[in-house]
Amino acid sequence: MLKLSSSQPDFAERLKALLAFETAQDPAVDAAVASICADVHHRGDAALVEHTNRFDRMQAAGMADLTLSREQLEAAWLRLPADVRDALSAAAERVRRYHEKQLAHSWSYEDEDGTLLGQQVTPLDRVGIYVPGGKAAYPSSVLMNALPAKVAGVGEIIMVVPTPGGERNDLVLAAAYIAGVDKVFTVGGAQAVAALAYGTETVPQVDKITGPGNAYVAAAKRRVFGVVGIDMVAGPSEILVICDGATDPDWVAMDLFSQAEHDEIAQAILLCPSADYIAQVEASIAKLLPSMPRRAIIEASLAGRGALIQVSDLAEACEISNYIAPEHLELSVADPDALLPQLRHAGAIFMGRFTSESLGDYCAGPNHVLPTSRTARFASPLGVYDFQKRSSLIRVSQAGAQKLGRIASLLAHGEGLTAHARAAELRLEDGTPR
């Protein structure tokens, strides 16, 4: 695992190299996705069934074999052990309660001349959520995508989830049940994204697609953006831990593992002023790694993109963190509130030694769909606001038309747009150009 010090003359260059991630699209993936999307666009259900059978080793005769009813979702819920149902319910309630705080409302006000100005907030009509399936089963992704949409008041939530070899995951289906998903189709990959974006005879066209997926799903989301909205095209998972050197090093090592185990190209970084503590964390990593079921993935991630970085103090750690703009930022320090004003760019900030990132992944309440690859500089977590849209409201009174008409007329003539000017002038009491 790479060890750096901010005092090194070449630190800035080495940090930049560490953060570099090749986001360019793979031409082979692009070509395959373009072909699949075009096929689903033109042939609808037939193409969707064909590609699903091919890629997911299915033998579906038609879309009826790839459609799950609410009764089937409920049955999956009832098959779960009681303690798992309780855990899923508790997580769902916390996620719902948090997102209810984000709900935006319409507003308006009147000028002194009676002109009304405002904003009308409305939910999207229909959204599609993509959930990974098969062995990579993520019920938490169902909750994090469906519940904000539900809170926003979205009219219909469509979920797609691949079931390779016909393998359905009860946890995922149960999460869809308690989150209020309206329709579930057991399809995945680029073909599922295309079906949601363009619609087929069975799959309704949606207004927005959210949720994580592999390179083919990401490429398909890029391709259909503009036809529908998308949440983001996410890169590898990331965690940055700022530690003052007083947290149990085993805790920090395991927190680094928690993201490294996602993917060989996930990123885990520690910033700490103490060289001795960094050595302790390094020892904890060596001690704990052999017991991890996903050891090979963690090792590859830490070796390829991980780092233990010594900084001069916590203030410098915050400066470096703002440059990194991590997906997950842990403040494993005595007084996290003191650091908060110095931090501008992070998807989610986990404050205090007891706040492990994994709690945010499952049940704390805030969304775990977060900006990656330094996009936290300008992007935000998925939320209710992603499932609402805003329309401006303008109702000009007769008196207001006299004042605004003259302003608009002058500006429109200045831009050489005569019809714009005349449309305003005709509403003036004397109807004359100004």
UniProtKB/Swiss-Prot annotation:
EC number: 1.1.1.23
Pathway participation: Amino-acid biosynthesis; L-histidine biosynthesis; L-histidine from 5-phospho-alpha-D-ribose 1-diphosphate: step 9/9
GO cellular component: cytosol
Cofactor: Zn(2+)
Residues annotated to bind NAD(+): 130, 191, 214
Keyword terms, alphabetized: Amino-acid biosynthesis, Histidine biosynthesis, Metal-binding, NAD, Oxidoreductase, Zinc
Catalytic activity reported: L-histidinol + 2 NAD(+) + H2O = L-histidine + 2 NADH + 3 H(+)
UniProt signal peptide: none
Cofactor note: Binds 1 zinc ion per subunit.
Coiled-coil spans in chain: none
Pfam assignment, any one: Histidinol_dh
Catalytic residues as annotated in Swiss-Prot or TrEMBL: 327-328
Binding site for substrate: 237, 259, 262, 328, 361, 415, 420
Entry's Gene Ontology molecular function annotations: histidinol dehydrogenase activity; NAD binding; zinc ion binding
Binding site for Zn(2+): 259, 262, 361, 420
Alphabetical GO biological process terms: L-histidine biosynthetic process
Function text: Catalyzes the sequential NAD-dependent oxidations of L-histidinol to L-histidinaldehyde and then to L-histidine.
Cross-referenced PANTHER family: HISTIDINE BIOSYNTHESIS TRIFUNCTIONAL PROTEIN, HISTIDINOL DEHYDROGENASE HDH
Homology family: Belongs to the histidinol dehydrogenase family.
Record-linked HAMAP family: HisD
Record protein name field: Histidinol dehydrogenase
Organism: Chromobacterium violaceum (strain ATCC 12472 / DSM 30191 / JCM 1249 / CCUG 213 / NBRC 12614 / NCIMB 9131 / NCTC 9757 / MK)
Chain's gene name: hisD
